[in-house]
Regions:
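Intrinsically disordered, low-complexity, charged terminal extensions of DNA damage-control enzymes
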Residues: 1-17, 219-221
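Structural motif
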Residues: 20-31, 43, 96-105, 201-206
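Non-catalytic DNA-binding core/recognition domains of DNA-processing enzymes
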Residues: 28, 45-58, 65-68, 102-112, ...
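Short, hydrophobic/amphipathic alpha-helical patches that form generic packing surfaces
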Residues: 31-43, 108-115, 156, 209-219
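Catalytic DNA-binding helix-loop module of base-excision-repair DNA glycosylases/AP lyases
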Residues: 38, 130-180
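Alpha-helix N-cap and coil->helix boundary residues
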Residues: 46-50, 104, 165, 169, ...
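Alpha-helical ds-nucleic-acid-binding substructure associated with the helix-hairpin-helix region
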Residues: 61-144
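A basic, often C-terminal nucleic-acid-binding module that engages the phosphate backbone, implemented
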Residues: 185-222
Length: 222
């Protein structure tokens, strides 16, 4: 048990409505990739959600929660359109990621999609059933610009209930609750242990669910 777990759990219990559950809802891995990459260092509701909606309007009959939009479909569309035209005319976003050597986000999307294609991962079900989740995590983490937050968030979007995305809002909450910050790795352990303590009163609560509750609360204050 993490040494700060009890303190963090008490803070969450007293600060948030823990009955509010997140609905990620995507049924196609293509939009999970887009949401993941374009949410990093961006305003989620102002930038990411409209961007995913634009992709869905162009290719998914207007429904970002539709199933059947595979990784290979995303790759083919980017190849046919051209990466810059895809960025300019479909998702309409020219953001970059990656410290000093920044890379356009559409190139990060493409690289991640190609890695999945090489592993024969086309759907959310393929992702969830991949034979070695540890290898999958290493592969995702190797994509330029994703880091711990992007890696964990993609797992969350693809249905993993046991992860948190250690972004600026999550770390802000940890500092408020515990008086100090923790590493990304500790953040995962802290959320996991806090949820274990809270489940007696909140049996439906998951790590992913607590992450969503915390994130929405702190994002609204930003």
């Amino acid at each position: 048990m993490h040494e700060l777990a009890e303190q963090f759990a008490k803070y969450c219990e007293s600060t948030f409505n823990l009955a509010t559950l997140s609905d990620y809802g995507y049924q196609s891995l293509s939009v999970c990739i887009l949401d993941c990459v374009y949410s990093l260092r961006a305003k989620y509701y102002a930038v990411t959600i409209p961007l995913v909606d634009r992709y869905a309007q162009t290719y998914m009959g207007g429904d970002p929660r539709a199933s059947g939009d595979t990784v290979s479909m995303l790759i083919s569309r980017m190849d046919e359109k051209g990466h810059k035209a895809f960025a300019d005319n479909v998702v309409k976003n020219q953001q970059k990621l990656g410290g000093r050597n920044k890379i356009p986000k559409e190139e990060i999307v493409y690289q991640l999609a190609r890695y999945f294609q090489a592993l024969h991962i086309e759907t959310i079900e393929d992702f969830q059933n991949f034979e070695c989740q540890e290898i999958l995590e290493i592969v995702i983490h190797a994509v330029h610009g994703l880091g711990d937050a992007g890696t964990n968030y993609l797992f969350m979007l693809a249905g993993d209930p046991n992860r948190c995305k250690p972004d600026v809002h999550i770390h802000h909450c940890v500092r408020d609750a515990c008086g100090r910050d923790v590493s990304n790795e500790e953040c995962q352990a802290l959320f996991t242990d806090a949820v274990a303590l809270l489940r007696g009163q909140h049996p439906s609560l998951t790590v992913r669910g607590l992450d969503g509750i915390v994130w929405r609360a702190y994002q609204s204050r930003a």
